[in-house]
Swiss-Prot record:
InterPro entries hit by this protein: Conotoxin (IPR004214)
Residues cleaved off as propeptide: 21-50
Organism whose genome encodes this protein: Californiconus californicus
CC terms in the record's Gene Ontology section: extracellular region
Pfam families for this protein: Conotoxin
Example GO molecular function: ion channel inhibitor activity
Annotated protein name in UniProt: Conotoxin Cl9.1
Disulphide bridges: 51-63, 56-67, 61-70
Tissue specificity statement from the Swiss-Prot or TrEMBL entry: Expressed by the venom duct.
Lineage of the organism: Eukaryota, Metazoa, Spiralia, Lophotrochozoa, Mollusca
Keyword annotations: Disulfide bond, Neurotoxin, Secreted, Signal, Toxin
Similarity comment text for this entry: Belongs to the conotoxin M superfamily.
Protein localization: Secreted
Coiled-coil residue windows: none
Domain notes: The cysteine framework is IX (C-C-C-C-C-C).
Length: 70
């Protein structure tokens, strides 16, 4: 009887919380992806930052003439 109780307690107190922690981690990652997909300006902002780097100041940035820094 005590052995069965020990197994049940082990499952409830150790294995079940470990499984729920893994699910929460996956949900956090999905939420982060949703935030990135919902923000179309993030990609545009990255392109603008690349256009204003030192390569642009040297004259060989490879971006469009509309860059402003070229």
């Amino acid at each position: 009887m005590m052995g069965k109780l020990g197994v049940v307690l082990f499952i409830c107190l150790v294995l079940f919380p470990l499984e729920t922690l893994q699910l929460e981690g996956g949900q956090q990652a999905d939420r982060h992806v949703d935030q990135l997909e919902g923000n179309p300006n993030r990609e545009t902002r990255t392109i603008e930052v690349r256009c204003t780097t030192m390569n642009c100041l040297k004259g060989h940035c490879g971006c469009s003439p509309d860059c402003g820094s070229c």
